[in-house]
Amino acid sequence: MVYGSTWKNWPELTKFAKQQEALFIPSVGPGYVDTRVRPWNGQNTRPRRKGKYYEESWEAALAARPAAVSVTSFNEWHEGTQIERAVPRREGSFRYEDYSEAGGPDFYLKLTQRMVAKFTELQF
């Protein structure tokens, strides 16, 4: 684990950055699994846990009281980092991450909207 990506370190990093007149911007993500393209990289897998991983990463970010939060997500469906609308799909033995168990195709967009609203409330 990298120090800056470890959630428990985010309050300290935020404080340190402020002392240096700099910014620490924590980055949250929905999960990660790239073993389909990098089979040796299983130690970096972060299961989504029906949205709990994403929500917990947001809560950790909000607890640090940063000036901004970034969302690490892209259309890297093979890495499971997407938050856009998703429906179940298989390609051979590979099953793409979808949100049917978590709450539907828009689950992560709605969760992002809720967490951004919480972040906005903390800023004012």
Task: Identify what each model region corresponds to.
Residues 1-124:
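Glycan-processing catalytic domains of CAZymes
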